[in-house]
A protein has these predicted regions:
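Short secondary-structure boundary/capping segments
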Residues: 1, 24-25, 46, 73-75, ...
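N-terminal active-site segment of His-dependent metallophosphoesterases
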Residues: 1-54, 62-71, 80, 135-138, ...
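Generic structural signal for conserved hydrophobic packing positions in ordered secondary structure
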Residues: 14, 48, 76, 85-87, ...
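Catalytic metal-binding/acid-base residues of hydrolase active sites
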Residues: 16, 39-40, 61-62, 89, ...
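A short, polar/proline- and glycine-enriched secondary-structure boundary/capping micro-motif
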Residues: 21-22, 94-98, 134-135, 160-168
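Conserved beta-sheet core of the metallophosphoesterase superfamily
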Residues: 55, 82-147, 152
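Metallo-beta-lactamase
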Residues: 66-90, 158
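Charged phosphate-binding loop/patch that engages nucleotide di/tri-phosphates or the phosphate backbone
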Residues: 143-175
Length: 175
């Protein structure tokens, strides 16, 4: 007899109104989607909802009537594991391990990062929206199985360094 299958959770943040086609493709097949804020427009949530059920929190740049309906924090249970969602991890006002959480999901920094602290996965998928500085455009996927959470960061756009060829006046030859 086999146990329950792993649950796949797509994690996206800081779209700022831009839901890239690459993000839609990367989220296909997930059981649920978490948006960790700075959504930018309600239609982003509508489009994500066509892929899987969405849990979303309000980010510091989310404004308007639609955003006012979103909570600042959210708790969800996936495969027997509690996940705590907020936009800025610096505003975490509880001890996640003591509260029984398996993961804390956040955004805000635009920097993808995952680390385990005291048995709790802290997961920031980075920004899937407009590129900021030289940070990658990314999202994440969580796998929940047998009471454990594992994360993976998926970079959506290839970062290609551009090194222009130097042109000197040498009779039209590139050097």
């Amino acid at each position: 007899m086999t146990g329950p299958r792993a649950r796949a959770v797509g994690v996206i943040s800081d779209t700022h109104g831009l839901l890239r086609p690459e993000a839609v493709v990367a989220l296909r097949g997930v059981d649920a989607i978490v948006h960790a804020g700075d959504i930018g427009a309600s239609d982003v949530l509508d489009r994500l909802g066509a892929i899987a059920p969405v849990t979303a929190v309000r980010g510091n740049n989310d404004r308007g009537a639609w955003a006012g309906k979103l909570p600042a924090t959210e708790v969800l249970e996936i495969g027997g594991v509690l996940l705590y969602v907020l936009h800025d991890v610096k505003e975490l006002a509880l001890d996640p391990r003591a509260a029984g959480f398996g993961a804390v999901i956040s955004g805000h920094s635009h920097q993808p990062r995952q680390e385990e602290r005291d048995g709790v996965l802290f997961f920031n998928p980075g920004s899937a929206g407009p590129r900021r500085f030289k940070l990658p455009v990314a999202l994440g996927r969580l796998s929940v199985e047998d009471g454990r959470v594992r994360g993976r960061i998926l970079e959506l756009l290839c970062r290609v360094a551009f090194h222009p060829t130097r042109v000197r006046s040498t009779g039209g030859q590139l050097q």
